[in-house]
Amino acid sequence: MAESMQRIASAFESARDLTLEAAAVASSRLGESSYFHYSKSIDSESLPGLLNSRYTREVRDGMKRVMSLMGSGDSSIELETHFADIVKNIGSDDVKVRRMVSVYLLRYAETNPNLALLSINSIQRSLSDSNPDVRALALKTLSDINIASLYPIILHSLKKTVIDSSEVVRCQVAMTLLKLFKEQGISIKDDVMPMLKSLLADSEPSVVSAALLLFQKAFAQELQLLHGHYRRYCSILNQLTENAQAIMIDIFIAYAKEYLPRPMVRDTSSDAEAIQLPDSFNQIPFPVYDVEYDHDLNLFLSSLKKLLHSPNAMVIVAVSKAFYQLSSPKTFKDSGIVDSLLRLTVSSYICSEIKELVLQSILVYCCSDPSLFRSHYKRFFLMPSDTENISIFKLKILSILVSDSNCKHIVNELKFVAGTEQSASILVEVSNTLSVCAQISSKWSSQIISWLLDRISSNTPIDKEVTASQINVLRSLIQKDPIKHIATVVKLSKMLSNHDLLPSAKAPIIWLLGEYVQVEPRICPDVLRRLLPQFSKEHAHVRLQILNLAAKLLSHDVDSYSGDMEYDIGTSRIGQMFEAALQLAKFDDEYDVRDRARMLASIFEQKRYEIATLLLQAPKPYPMASLNYCRDSFNLSALNLYPDMENYYELLPWNADPQASDRTPCEVKDYSKLKNSFSSSSYFGRNEVEFTNKPKRSASVSSVPSNTFTSSHGKKYQLQSLDEFFSDVSARQSVPKAKRVIIEESTSEETDHTDDESGSSSGDESTESSYVSSSEEETTE
Amino acid sequence: MYTSIYITDSKKNLVFEYLLTSQAPTFQQLCSKIAGRDAAMDAMVAISKDMSLYRQAVGPEKLWYWALCQACGDPLEPQMFLAQYHQVLIEYFDKEALTVKKLVNNADRLALLLHAMLDAGEVAVTDSNRLRQLVPLRNDLSTILNSATKTLANTVKYADSKQLFGAPVATGKVEAGQTVPWRTADCRYVNNEIYVDLVETVNATLRQKGSSLTLINGSLSGKIDVKCYLSGNPTVQLKLRTSGHPLDNSALHRCVELGEAGVATMNFVPPDGRFTLAEYAIDLSAISQAARRLTNLGLVTVSLASGLGQHRDEFEIKVIIGNSTQVAAIEDLRITVYFPDISDAAKIKILRTTHGGWESDLSRVRGVWAFDKQTAVGSVPVLRGCVENPESTPHAPPVFPSHLAVSYSHVGQLPSGIRVDTIALSDLPPGSKPFKGVKYTSRAGDYIVRA
């Protein structure tokens, strides 16, 4: 098939005597590639001809060429020079051409504002087109022309279109207002505000979605605007667009913290007074508790559960954030959001960049309460297809989830990873996680120490960075119980000369040996003797530690000296070694080393040995492994998240004294009676049945008078703005109105059918009955 | 707030760019800015104080999507938008995967789609049916030629060109007949067809303990894709036989209304064209009986035995392919064998294979046992080999593989045993005889067997 097509294509291409138009028609019909070749042949000379042609097809070919030039970053044709030719097509009959001109204007209008203004007239004319998509496009194009003198005109058109009968246009109004706001800022607040209020009260979920976006970007502080809509929005949450769902959750978190009473926590094991939900997620002092939510907050939290099946990762994470900010770990666990988050992390069809962000969120929750994900720890074992970043975050999560019961599995898994993984940064993270496992019990600690020693000394050609990290883990483990691990220290000291170690590994070993002076003084002098000749070749950190080791050794030697004579630095071997180190350090490049040398020199020269003992032999506290984050003080910066992730999880404070606010639903603006068609009610009618049923199931929600904000059927006729709108329309334009009436009548039958349908579609036979009614329709037509 | 969107191949050659303002940098300018940084390999690079460049690699053909945008409240938004854009392109062009050529040929459509999706620098529309309405897709001759074989007789009968093209006809009135926001109004097809594709990917880590395998960690990641070419506004009822899996945490397309039976019965008014109906994950380690855990791994199980033979230095890999009437053959079976570090002089020697051939690798830590395109079900391929020590150290301890990675795919049944019970269509125009197709595809993703 493909071959025959190629033959046809080549036949057409060889037909040189065909006119340009005929060739274009023929080859463009044949397939994209041949059309692309034809399109490529359009150059700077022939482009104006096409753009100015009387034939729509030629104009379209010309515009397609312009689009592909813009898209490919190709600068062989200067598109600015054809500005007028292109923009004059804004009045084309073909909507696609108009769209393409609009794309062009978006990018180039600012380069040529005077010419761009010429197009305004035809754009404004299409604002009253009968097709709502065209009206919306006109509004969009108008506002995309980024010229300050246009703003009053746009604002004027918006005031007219904000009550347009089509939700597509009203959505566009919200987006256009956002554009204006981004340009003009707070100065046009008085103009925008009434329109925003009307958009927020819209009955169409798609308009509410756009209005919420405008609200979040422009007036996020004006939460009081939402009082009357709060309950209705909770019920239509799952009908909004996915992006709007995430935005609404974000807005409502802020709203709940500002205006809703704080939840109370009651200890179920005793009769103590209920306390307020603590600011931080993990600070509830009772082992078993119940949380009592305000019923409006409960309404929001239960409406979130409808979103647990969302395929959108952003929505799932937003839902989890809402539970994290507004509720307790218990509610978080009961809500089922844990499963939804886990589903995202194991899915094979979600790209790794998104998985990584989901894992970062899980890491934040784990830090607050490890018990949330503890039973699912196996889900965080590394998989071969995981990227480096995913692996690192999984390891961090594992290091938090590790406990007595799962330690065995996790350690085994980590050992396997250490043996097969190639990436250095993952291996470093593995050693960090192991050090956390080692803190679980002394049994694990000794097992991990011997395993680490094995790994380091078996001559595997692994990265030096990894060796350094393993040595550091080893050092911190040994320090916990020095006497038990003398043999390990001896092995480590041998590594100083046998292995080619990084400075970041060498310096800690030398430091560790210095700490061992009191425990086992016999090892150190020999190590120091071997280090001194290499002094000048070492890294600054290592040099500093060598000097410290010499000083510690000397200080210990002085303390343990029991002779009658005063200790003489000049004659003792250790004293001489110290002098040598001092001599080397005094001429060091590094300021730090010289400074330390001077300080130590003056202490020992003036024979202030007590000070030296205090300074150099003080017992050091045992370091907590670096990964054991934030048990008490919650600090996200230790987790190494992306910066915007950190901002995202900043905890909002609860308002200590929320103002009394009235959340009785306010009037909804329903434009559906103005529409050409009524059939969408069959869908929303069906959903309304569902909504009024749903609250009955959960006792907490049923207390809300649900029908006042869900069913708006009865109210449609009472709306005042309806009459106003019609009088407005008839004054403005009479022809489209007549058109409307005709279509309205012709479709009214349909409405009756669909209304019946929504009434009967509660039982199982709904599909059957609707099938019957649709066939009736067929016959009546 | 988005400033520009770019698509490149994995070598950063520009395929398509879309700039939302006149000040937005072209990809060339941007490239020179991030050229010096290693961090360009990261998914997010900060360009200036409040501008970041987000990157997402998609699909086997490794298209890279880039978005330059101002930091917004939600850290997932830019990545999510890039994923949505990719999904929209897939659904819009109705393809399994996108090629660079397809994108270059359709630069105008890519721009128009983005023009509709982004407004005021924010995400406005992401629904693919709505986008197809705004940017109508004109089916070219090749589409007709492709479908001609099947429907030649039908196509000739209907002389009307609109029906000839077999594509939904966009009417001027947008809302006329639109029942649900996600479905294009007034779809008309000559052949009413609905295809349901169930895909499952096995991700599992197993350990060989003696002669038996134990599951360390595993999950099945499943997806239900639907291709729907139905006239009017039909309602579809899809009943699944879930074989005891709860599927509670599934992700569902917004069109799905759950019945009393949960995910097992889904009622929906489908969007037109291609879409993902549901995604689910089955945690294998949560299944309580050990035997059931292993049966849910699918048709192919691999075991690894070592320390065999006269010198106790041989290993044997045995692939047990279960028998099934629904599956014709296993496709693209490959087993990658990983060895611990072996010295340079040692040699991997294959003693015997019943199927396929051995491909060694320069890295010395792995080799691949590659099978033919198709392997019959019910067969038990075996490979036996050893790592020969160099002559200088003949008595070194024998080396055995540390783990195996298995990859394969087959059609016909799913590892979890989930099947479609019925697809019931209602509200179709009278007289239409819809065609319903169901396809099951299984794949091995991260399937590891450790020694």
Swiss-Prot record, chain A:
Annotated PANTHER family: ADAPTOR COMPLEX SUBUNIT BETA FAMILY MEMBER
Gene Ontology biological process terms, A to Z: Golgi to vacuole transport; protein targeting to vacuole
Cystine crosslinks: none
Membrane topology: Peripheral membrane protein
UniProt biased composition (Low complexity): 759-774
Comp. bias regions, Acidic residues: 746-758
Location in or out of the cell: Golgi apparatus; Cytoplasmic vesicle, Clathrin-coated vesicle membrane
Source species: Eremothecium gossypii (strain ATCC 10895 / CBS 109.51 / FGSC 9923 / NRRL Y-1056) (Yeast)
Gene3D superfamilies the record matches: Leucine-rich Repeat Variant
HEAT repeat residue numbers: 113-151, 153-186, 187-224, 294-332, 521-559
Entry keyword Transport: yes
Keyword Coiled coil tagged: no
Main location: Golgi
Coiled-coil spans in chain: none
Protein name: AP-3 complex subunit beta
Biased composition (Polar residues): 699-712
One cellular component term from this protein's GO annotations in UniProt: AP-3 adaptor complex
Region Disordered, residue ranges: 694-713, 731-781
Curated annotation (Swiss-Prot), chain B:
Protein name listed in UniProt: AP-3 complex subunit mu
SUPFAM superfamilies: Second domain of Mu2 adaptin subunit (ap50) of ap2 adaptor (SSF49447), SNARE-like (SSF64356)
Entry-linked Gene3D superfamilies: 3.30.450.60, Mu homology domain, subdomain B
Domain MHD: 191-450
Predominant subcellular localization, coarse grouping: Golgi
Membrane disposition: Peripheral membrane protein
Family statement drawn from the similarity comment of this UniProt entry: Belongs to the adaptor complexes medium subunit family.
The UniProt record lists the keyword Lyase: no
Chain's role: Part of the AP-3 complex, an adaptor-related complex which is not clathrin-associated. The complex is associated with the Golgi region as well as more peripheral structures. It facilitates the budding of vesicles from the Golgi membrane and may be directly involved in trafficking to the vacuole.
Gene Ontology biological process terms from the UniProt entry: endocytosis; Golgi to vacuole transport; protein targeting to vacuole
RNA-binding in keyword set: no
PANTHER family: AP COMPLEX SUBUNIT MU
Quaternary structure annotation from Swiss-Prot or TrEMBL: Adaptor protein complex 3 (AP-3) is a heterotetramer composed of 2 large adaptins (APL5 and APL6), a medium adaptin (APM3) and a small adaptin (APS3).
Organism encoding this protein: Eremothecium gossypii (strain ATCC 10895 / CBS 109.51 / FGSC 9923 / NRRL Y-1056) (Yeast)
One GO location term (cellular component): cytoplasmic vesicle membrane
Keywords from the UniProt entry: Cytoplasmic vesicle, Golgi apparatus, Membrane, Protein transport, Transport
Protein's cellular compartments: Golgi apparatus; Cytoplasmic vesicle membrane
